[in-house]
Regions:
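Aromatic (tryptophan-biased) beta-strands that constitute blades/sheets of beta-rich domains
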Residues: 22-42, 73-80, 112-124, 153-154
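Acidic, small-residue rich beta-repeat scaffolds with periodic aromatic anchors
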Residues: 125-154
Length: 154
């Protein structure tokens, strides 16, 4: 019971309470904490633990957050121009993959964008399969990307 509440809404808007809001609460061995998020679109927050970096990576609306897993303190916040579709975390990668409708981002633990790829079709599905990031477009096309480099995978 208890724990710190961090409101990250002001990072998104000067009036975050006018937007869609969600709270993410973590109860763990290191204690409890809660973050309050804001989005211009209706979404449900999803998260994955990036254990090698000690971050809980959260996607909500247009934003991805790298939060300290034990405290919820933001390490980085990344905004996309289009809604986020998925995120992928692996101890085999030096970055987290953030998939938006029109772009793929590789974001390092300090929030630096390692690489970015723009897509010509809206991405409707993304899966990490056989060490390839497989993207499905609105038009039905499928594209495979090397998740480490962002280059086309054969």
């Amino acid at each position: 019971m208890g724990g710190e509440l961090r409101d990250l809404g002001p990072e998104v808007s000067t009036d975050p309470d006018a937007l869609c809001r969600a709270e993410l609460r973590i109860d763990g061995p290191g204690g409890a904490w809660t973050v309050r998020l804001a989005s211009t679109i209706n979404d449900e927050p999803t998260a994955q633990l990036w254990d090698t970096e000690g971050q809980l990576v959260v996607k909500y609306g247009f934003h991805a957050y790298g939060l300290a897993a034990r405290t919820g303190a933001p390490a980085w916040i990344h905004r996309s121009a289009t809604p986020l579709v998925a995120l992928f975390v692996s101890s085999r990668l030096r970055h987290v993959l953030v998939q938006a409708e029109l772009e793929t981002f590789a974001i390092e633990a300090d929030g630096t964008v390692a690489w970015r790829i723009a897509h010509s079709d809206v991405v409707t599905g993304a899966n990490l399969v056989g060490w390839r990031l497989v993207l499905t477009g609105y038009g039905g096309g499928v594209n495979a990307i090397d998740p480490a480099t962002g280059r086309a995978a054969g």
